[in-house]
């Protein structure tokens, strides 16, 4: 209902304000600038399926700010060199890949009502494109990890995650592009990301 929507909006704004106030003073202006720069992409995305062949790219850019803003909050700058750049690019490729899979579930309905998606635009090459996106994301993360001098313990986690991504692509088929398959694929990407995060944390504390 409208009332529920307003309540949720007020709660989200309250928590957002709390997060902003929790950011170190020296980082706050840069974080707010990045958040402002992300707004055009966030506002464009809901309508992008009507006028852009690859709306998933806009969503990927939105997700990319989830790398830039925490980095800015931690370092008070974007001077992260190759590590930051490649983490950002990896996020964009990874997001484009799994959201393309998610778009496969809506492919028939989107065609019926004249909407666009990367799944429709890529057609038969969509699964191959997802595989390439995952490979590029893994490769970029490997370079970023190397430049960040992560410990040896990270690399088994990276290898398992990389193989896991490609396994998920292998399990996709033209006969199983339904909501359930796409949802499971999306959930497994969360698990793979959590595995990578665990590897990063362990490499810093062991």
Language-model regions, residue ranges each:
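Extended hydrophobic alpha-helices typical of membrane-associated regions
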Residues: 139, 143-206
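Alpha-helical transmembrane segments
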Residues: 82-94, 150-158
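Alpha-helical membrane-embedding segments
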Residues: 18-27, 67-74, 90-101, 144-148, ...
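Multi-pass membrane catalytic core of lipid/isoprenoid biosynthesis enzymes
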Residues: 1-35, 112-152, 158
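Residue-level recognition of pore/gate-forming positions within transmembrane alpha-helices
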Residues: 13-16, 39-42, 63-64, 91, ...
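Alpha-helical transmembrane segments of multi-pass membrane proteins
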Residues: 38, 42-46, 90-95, 102, ...
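Intramembrane alpha-helical segments
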Residues: 2-82, 86, 167-173, 185
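Cytosolic, membrane-interface loops and tails of multi-pass inner-membrane proteins
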Residues: 99-124, 170-181
